[in-house]
């Protein structure tokens, strides 16, 4: 194996699909995969403008395409996969990143909210796996990555349904690792802590909430989308070729703090 960083962490020749790729962590991960040499399909809801994000990558000289896709809609998910295969003939890496925190303490529809998060964080990921794992395996193997959360590893006062469904999708990644490892597919979950994005603004933009969280974070700061994207490139590249069935925590040490 070539141990030079530009080879060890290269995704050249790969085709990657990133869901929830129009903004935030998903967009940073798509950009990092493209910079590492992958051809990237950026999928997202219409209001996140995945086509615009892809167009910016193309302007920079990368190969990318944007697809409007609600991953909870089976027909749209099938179209996403077929569009990718028709365009580039293969799939090597999946990052199932689409997500939403819909919990609202005291809400009368708490169970309905949990159902919606289950559909997004678990069922949609399972459906994407069903559509893409055979393609990845037939192409010689690759990486199926699931964006989980620190909330799936800790008890939560507020993010109850979010934490439950994120814990479930990390388990789904472990199951895929066992079921598909013999065909060359690696599956891992990634669990970010608080990352400075619009999604985390209720914590990062609230002085009291931010201070309370940082007291529990040994590194004393919030993470950046690029720091999550670095792990995605690692797991998709030759550098991550012997890593599977893991839940990679990127939280500045919050989980292990006393």
Where does each model-flagged region fall?
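Conserved glycine-rich cofactor-binding loop
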Residues: 15, 22-24
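Short, small/polar-rich loop/turn modules that mediate ligand/substrate recognition or access, typified
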Residues: 95, 141, 181, 186, ...
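Alpha-helical segment proximal to the catalytic Tyr-Lys
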Residues: 134, 178-182, 241
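Residue(s) in the substrate-gating loop at a strand-loop-helix junction
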Residues: 149
């Amino acid at each position: 194996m070539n141990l030079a960083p530009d080879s060890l962490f290269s995704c050249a020749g790969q085709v990657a699909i990133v869901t929830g790729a129009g903004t935030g962590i998903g967009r940073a991960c798509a950009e990092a995969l493209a910079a590492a040499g992958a051809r990237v399909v950026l999928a997202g809801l219409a209001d996140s403008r995945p086509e615009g994000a892809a167009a910016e990558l193309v302007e920079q000289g990368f190969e990318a395409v944007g697809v409007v896709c609600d991953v909870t809609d089976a027909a749209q998910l099938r179209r996403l996969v077929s569009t990718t295969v028709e365009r580039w003939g293969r799939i090597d890496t999946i990052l199932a990143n689409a997500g939403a925190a819909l919990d609202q303490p005291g809400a009368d529809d708490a169970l309905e909210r949990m159902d919606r998060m289950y559909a997004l964080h678990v069922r949609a990921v399972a459906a994407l796996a069903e559509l893409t794992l055979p393609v990845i395996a037939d192409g010689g193997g690759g990486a199926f990555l699931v964006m989980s959360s620190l909330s799936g590893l800790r008890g939560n006062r507020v993010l109850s349904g979010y934490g439950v469904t994120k814990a479930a999708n990390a388990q789904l990644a472990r199951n895929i690792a066992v079921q598909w490892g013999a065909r060359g597919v690696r599956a891992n979950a990634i669990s970010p802590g608080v990352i400075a994005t619009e999604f985390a603004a209720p914590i990062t933009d609230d002085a009291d909430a931010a201070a309370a969280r940082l007291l529990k974070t040994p590194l004393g700061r919030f993470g950046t989308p690029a720091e999550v994207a670095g792990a995605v490139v690692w797991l998709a590249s030759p550098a991550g070729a012997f890593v599977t069935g893991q839940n990679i925590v990127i939280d500045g040490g919050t989980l292990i703090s006393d």
